[in-house]
């Protein structure tokens, strides 16, 4: 099981902005993170709409983090591009049980517990930590 490519790229884009600590244009972000410009712009639009990234128009335009990297978690980024993380569709409000059951079953209880644990872990990792650990690896 993997996160989507869009979430992977969104995490890279936020990392790029956190690491560089400056306003960057979409083309530079795209090149530095090896993400196509078109896909970068789509993701940046979602990140701006979610309030994680600020965009600026004009000569000195570009993108920068809307708040400090220490206040942006991996969970924030995944939610911005995909919505809430849930291991199984059966956890959604209108999720349909693929076996036709109604109510809560043993599988749903397990999927909910795992989803909550993954969300806690993703919410515990912020981009200041990631940048700091990357700097220690050099």
Residue ranges with predicted function:
Residues 49-52, 80:
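Residue cluster at the C-terminal edge of the helix-turn-helix DNA-binding motif
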